[in-house]
Amino acid sequence: MGYLVPTVIEQSSRGERAYDIYSRLLKDRIIMLTGPVEDGMANSIIAQLLFLDAQDNTKDIYLYVNTPGGSVSAGLAIVDTMNFIKSDVQTIVMGMAASMGTIIASSGTKGKRFMLPNAEYLIHQPMGGAGQGTQQTDMAIVAEQLLKTRKRLEQILADNSNRSLEQIHKDAERDHWMDAKETLEYGFIDEIMENNSLK
């Protein structure tokens, strides 16, 4: 079942203007990254990041994150774009940042990574596999690619936290959930936000 996207009506000197809520938030440099990370969603997030950076790269972009994770390639495309643009990207985790969501949320500008008090973080090793009827050589290729991907993601998590690569590897061996305080101690965020004090 779908959900209704609210419309916001604004008054101006030239009359009324209606926006869907996401377009209105974009005017205030707010991007909502919600739901599974997949190619279509990533393309939309990337386009919004590029648009806001081209509009004014001296102002921060606010990326609100609530995702169970998803595609590694789609998520890394978002992370690469966040690093590519000149604007600082503030990340605000609400609900959860799990799996690829953790990579994205922790890749915000250092000092500007936030989390709401009841949100959660999850790190784990990447998942994938070969389909039924796959040849043994293809399975070996998939396994090798998964190991490479795991190393790359763990390096990003180590760079984005105050933990060693070895600690990340150990903690990501199985699902490792963290509440806001644990995430702050881990170094993935810089502050737990009780109210909206973003600048």
UniProtKB/Swiss-Prot annotation:
<dbReference type="GO" id="GO:0051117">
    <property type="term" value="F:ATPase binding"/>
</dbReference>
<keyword id="KW-0346">Stress response</keyword>
<dbReference type="GO" id="GO:0009368">
    <property type="term" value="C:endopeptidase Clp complex"/>
</dbReference>
<keyword id="KW-0378">Hydrolase</keyword>
<feature type="active site" description="Nucleophile">
    <location>
        <position position="99"/>
    </location>
</feature>
<comment type="function">
    <text>Cleaves peptides in various proteins in a process that requires ATP hydrolysis. Has a chymotrypsin-like activity. Plays a major role in the degradation of misfolded proteins.</text>
</comment>
<dbReference type="GO" id="GO:0004176">
    <property type="term" value="F:ATP-dependent peptidase activity"/>
</dbReference>
<dbReference type="GO" id="GO:0006515">
    <property type="term" value="P:protein quality control for misfolded or incompletely synthesized proteins"/>
</dbReference>
<dbReference type="InterPro" id="IPR023562">
    <property type="entry name" value="ClpP/TepA"/>
</dbReference>
<keyword id="KW-0720">Serine protease</keyword>
<comment type="subunit">
    <text>Fourteen ClpP subunits assemble into 2 heptameric rings which stack back to back to give a disk-like structure with a central cavity, resembling the structure of eukaryotic proteasomes.</text>
</comment>
<dbReference type="InterPro" id="IPR029045">
    <property type="entry name" value="ClpP/crotonase-like_dom_sf"/>
</dbReference>
<feature type="active site">
    <location>
        <position position="124"/>
    </location>
</feature>
<keyword id="KW-0963">Cytoplasm</keyword>
<dbReference type="InterPro" id="IPR033135">
    <property type="entry name" value="ClpP_His_AS"/>
</dbReference>
<dbReference type="InterPro" id="IPR001907">
    <property type="entry name" value="ClpP"/>
</dbReference>
<protein>
    <recommendedName>
        <fullName>ATP-dependent Clp protease proteolytic subunit</fullName>
        <ecNumber>3.4.21.92</ecNumber>
    </recommendedName>
</protein>
<keyword id="KW-0645">Protease</keyword>
<dbReference type="Pfam" id="PF00574">
    <property type="entry name" value="CLP_protease"/>
</dbReference>
<dbReference type="GO" id="GO:0005737">
    <property type="term" value="C:cytoplasm"/>
</dbReference>
<dbReference type="GO" id="GO:0004252">
    <property type="term" value="F:serine-type endopeptidase activity"/>
</dbReference>
<dbReference type="InterPro" id="IPR018215">
    <property type="entry name" value="ClpP_Ser_AS"/>
</dbReference>
<comment type="similarity">
    <text>Belongs to the peptidase S14 family.</text>
</comment>
